[in-house]
């Protein structure tokens, strides 16, 4: 097999349990001057960045909502968790299928 052959892998994603963990990653990236893209999909607050070899990475925290995808809006990483979640709700509440996760009618949203 040709190990140098490009793959279709775009990035690796890592779910964290708390908003504070996203903030910890942000602070670490800031401390070592790594650029990142803070992107909100409505259902998650994410940080996208590259590792030293250029592989795409995402660290994300689930929001309490489900939103039809694709979505992507840059979010302010200086917000507190409460402010960020209020911003998410205001930003995405008029999008198709916006609902609390537990009320979502999409089967895969609440799978464990």
Locations of the language-model features?
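Zn2+-dependent peptidoglycan hydrolase active-site motif and core
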Residues: 2
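Vicinal oxygen chelate
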Residues: 5-7, 12-56, 61-67, 79-111
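Polybasic, low-complexity binding patches
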Residues: 71-77
């Amino acid at each position: 097999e040709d190990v140098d052959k490009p793959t279709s892998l775009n990035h690796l994603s890592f779910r964290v349990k708390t908003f504070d963990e996203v903030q910890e990653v942000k602070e670490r990236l800031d401390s070592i001057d790594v650029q990142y893209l803070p992107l909100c999909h409505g259902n998650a607050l994410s940080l996208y960045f590259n590792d030293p070899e250029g592989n795409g990475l995402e660290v994300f925290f689930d929001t309490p909502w489900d939103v039809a995808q694709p979505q992507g809006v840059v979010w302010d990483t200086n917000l507190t968790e409460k402010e960020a979640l209020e911003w998410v709700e205001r930003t995405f509440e008029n999008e198709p299928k916006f609902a609390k996760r537990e009320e979502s009618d999409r089967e895969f949203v609440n799978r464990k």
